[in-house]
Regions:
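Acidic-basic catalytic patches of nuclease active cores, encompassing PD-(D/E)XK
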Residues: 1-34
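Catalytic cores of nucleic-acid endonucleases
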Residues: 2, 60-110
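A short beta-turn/loop motif at secondary-structure boundaries
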Residues: 35-39, 94
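A generic beta-sheet turn/junction motif
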Residues: 38-40, 49-51, 108-109
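Short, low-complexity, polybasic intrinsically disordered segments
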Residues: 107-125
Length: 125
């Protein structure tokens, strides 16, 4: 039973990330990576939008009230470290950027997306 729940959560997370990527692409963003892993951590989606390098954390919850609080300080720190590592190791892709930001995308059980741009400052990491 637990394995089924874990697989269901995994597939649900993939669907939320796919929905998020499509939403950004509709806005004209270029997806650079999905589920990027490096020694510092994992980043759900990395994209380029209007010259800005965007690191996106996607969260899905049944209860929308829990969504905004579902990204912990520890997760933000790891995301910041992973983003720094990405920029250092992908300077050929990131050399012409005008800046970077961290977005949080909250996906409710109803499938609605809420994109929170600049959910966290890069300086806070």
């Amino acid at each position: 039973m637990r394995a089924r729940r874990g697989r269901g959560a995994y597939l649900s997370g993939l669907a939320a990330e796919e929905q998020t990527a499509r939403a950004y692409q509709k806005r004209g963003a270029e997806i650079l990576a999905r589920r990027h892993r490096n020694e510092a951590g994992e980043i759900d989606i990395i994209l380029l939008e209007d010259g800005i390098l965007v690191f996106v954390e996607v969260k899905q919850r049944k209860n929308r009230a829990e969504l905004a609080e579902s990204i912990t300080e520890r997760q933000w720190r790891r995301l910041g470290l992973a983003a720094t590592h990405y920029m250092m190791t992908h300077s050929d892709e990131t050399g012409a950027i005008r800046g970077c930001r961290f977005d949080a995308v909250l996906v409710g059980a109803d499938g609605r997306l809420e994109i929170i741009e600049n959910a966290r400052s890069f300086d806070e990491h």
